[in-house]
Amino acid sequence: MAIILGVDPGSRITGYGLIRSEGRLLEYLDSGCIRVGEKPMAERLQTIFHSLAVLIGEYRPEEFAIEQVFMARNPDSALKLGQARGAAIVSAANSGLAVHEYSARQVKQAVVGTGGADKSQVQHMVQALLGLSRKPQADAADALAIALCHAHMNQSVLRMARTGGKVRSGRVRQP
């Protein structure tokens, strides 16, 4: 049984999602958004870092998964996104968690079945897979999808290990 914290980083809104994964059983624990608004960048990063540290302290996840950086058209946006990711990653690493990274395409493929899925499809599948009464907000749904992707990858790795096969997973950074 593992508690997984998924994070969808952003310079203004960072989504988070917590699930419990035991074999094929998935249980929703919590999700939401860390909204930092128009504060100076250093304060935004501090808020992301501390908010995730509080969640990690409260739920004690064993796994941490985050979306990889994609190249945005606007270099300034890409830099800010990278900084938000850094704050989230350091928060996890400070708690001794290994950081697992997945591309947006990997996440969509694992949750929806196609790497080209749109946000509404991701929200719908997250709602269905976790048995939620309503669709989560988009950033929280993305974070839950990242956690679900990691749970799926863990199951694939375990299955392949039992059969002696090889499997390629997301990148892993050890603290």
From Swiss-Prot:
<keyword id="KW-0540">Nuclease</keyword>
<keyword id="KW-0227">DNA damage</keyword>
<comment type="similarity">
    <text>Belongs to the RuvC family.</text>
</comment>
<keyword id="KW-0479">Metal-binding</keyword>
<feature type="binding site">
    <location>
        <position position="139"/>
    </location>
    <ligand>
        <name>Mg(2+) 1</name>
    </ligand>
</feature>
<dbReference type="InterPro" id="IPR020563">
    <property type="entry name" value="X-over_junc_endoDNase_Mg_BS"/>
</dbReference>
<dbReference type="GO" id="GO:0048476">
    <property type="term" value="C:Holliday junction resolvase complex"/>
</dbReference>
<dbReference type="GO" id="GO:0006310">
    <property type="term" value="P:DNA recombination"/>
</dbReference>
<dbReference type="GO" id="GO:0000287">
    <property type="term" value="F:magnesium ion binding"/>
</dbReference>
<keyword id="KW-0234">DNA repair</keyword>
<comment type="subunit">
    <text>Homodimer which binds Holliday junction (HJ) DNA. The HJ becomes 2-fold symmetrical on binding to RuvC with unstacked arms; it has a different conformation from HJ DNA in complex with RuvA. In the full resolvosome a probable DNA-RuvA(4)-RuvB(12)-RuvC(2) complex forms which resolves the HJ.</text>
</comment>
<feature type="active site">
    <location>
        <position position="139"/>
    </location>
</feature>
<keyword id="KW-0460">Magnesium</keyword>
<keyword id="KW-0238">DNA-binding</keyword>
<dbReference type="InterPro" id="IPR002176">
    <property type="entry name" value="X-over_junc_endoDNase_RuvC"/>
</dbReference>
<dbReference type="GO" id="GO:0008821">
    <property type="term" value="F:crossover junction DNA endonuclease activity"/>
</dbReference>
<feature type="binding site">
    <location>
        <position position="8"/>
    </location>
    <ligand>
        <name>Mg(2+) 1</name>
    </ligand>
</feature>
<feature type="active site">
    <location>
        <position position="67"/>
    </location>
</feature>
<keyword id="KW-0233">DNA recombination</keyword>
<dbReference type="GO" id="GO:0006281">
    <property type="term" value="P:DNA repair"/>
</dbReference>
<dbReference type="GO" id="GO:0003677">
    <property type="term" value="F:DNA binding"/>
</dbReference>
<dbReference type="InterPro" id="IPR036397">
    <property type="entry name" value="RNaseH_sf"/>
</dbReference>
<dbReference type="Pfam" id="PF02075">
    <property type="entry name" value="RuvC"/>
</dbReference>
<dbReference type="GO" id="GO:0005737">
    <property type="term" value="C:cytoplasm"/>
</dbReference>
<keyword id="KW-0963">Cytoplasm</keyword>
<comment type="function">
    <text>The RuvA-RuvB-RuvC complex processes Holliday junction (HJ) DNA during genetic recombination and DNA repair. Endonuclease that resolves HJ intermediates. Cleaves cruciform DNA by making single-stranded nicks across the HJ at symmetrical positions within the homologous arms, yielding a 5'-phosphate and a 3'-hydroxyl group; requires a central core of homology in the junction. The consensus cleavage sequence is 5'-(A/T)TT(C/G)-3'. Cleavage occurs on the 3'-side of the TT dinucleotide at the point of strand exchange.</text>
</comment>
<keyword id="KW-0378">Hydrolase</keyword>
<keyword id="KW-0255">Endonuclease</keyword>
<protein>
    <recommendedName>
        <fullName>Crossover junction endodeoxyribonuclease RuvC</fullName>
        <ecNumber>3.1.21.10</ecNumber>
    </recommendedName>
</protein>
<feature type="binding site">
    <location>
        <position position="67"/>
    </location>
    <ligand>
        <name>Mg(2+) 2</name>
    </ligand>
</feature>
<dbReference type="InterPro" id="IPR012337">
    <property type="entry name" value="RNaseH-like_sf"/>
</dbReference>
<feature type="active site">
    <location>
        <position position="8"/>
    </location>
</feature>
